[in-house]
Amino acid sequence: MRAPTTDLLGEPWTAETIHFPPDDEGAVVATLIHRRADQPTGRAVLHVHGFADYFFQTQYAEFWTARGYDFYAVDLRKCGRSLLPHQSPHFASDLRDYFPDLDAAWHRVTQRDGHHHVVLSAHSTGGLTGSLWADERQPGLAGMVLNAPWLDLHGSTLMRTLGTIAVERIGGRTPYRIVPRRVDGFYARSLHHEHEGEWEFDQELKPIMSFPVFAGWLRAVRRGHAQLQSGLDVGCPTLVLSSASTAWPQEMGDDVHQNDVVLDVEQIRRWSPALGRHVTYVGIPGARHDVTLSLPEPRAQVYDELGRWLTAYVDGDEH
């Protein structure tokens, strides 16, 4: 473990490198990013990113710190700040490979730093991984906020079934084989200020044309989907936010900015109740895949919904 240093986001953000035993590719690290609230607090949020992503959503973090929560984010092994030169980006053969990263982050947030009221926040694939971790570990979360969690593939039942069978075979035999897919870059372009968006992020850590999808990783995701769809109990109130609609545009335009162009939101709606016994789902009209990076009007609704949910189910439950 290295002492926290100033993060690539600059002051007041810090980053702490956490070392783990090497795997088949070599050395492994995760990175814990942190910003304190203005006043000392026992409340915190721990955020987990999605695929081909890393933590850069500072406006989202500022929502939490203004509410009196210390904010933490973890860049998981082989992702974002934690991607090392010898590694296959975002590769994991089992989503449980990420559990030590979350365990280490949780220990630092709670045992070391003394927070006793902690919300787990997660986006896209991170929402799947975080939910499986919460179900298995039962850490005593105060709440969980999932931003467009990846709970199933899109497409017909037949295509999802056939695809899963193929991925199971190929991913088991040749886990580092790259899965062919159509990548148009529309989504990342809609976000970045040098293209059609307003946000700033490192295009090496979050490439406009994404990262390769490895068969072993997709196999791990499909196994995670099956486990979630059999029913979880994350043990806390859960808010699921997504765009109200999905679109598969063929050109850059308004549809890219006003829909989820990555995941099928109908699958998010369908499977959200499988997360636990207390789940609230809200679809945000006009929102992007990462709802916190939406255009101003739907983004304002995101924060309104999140604030109301926290007031109703989470903030008042501190003890």
Predicted regions and their residues:
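N-terminal cap/lid segment of alpha/beta-hydrolase-fold proteins
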Residues: 1-39
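Serine-hydrolase catalytic core
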Residues: 178-279, 283
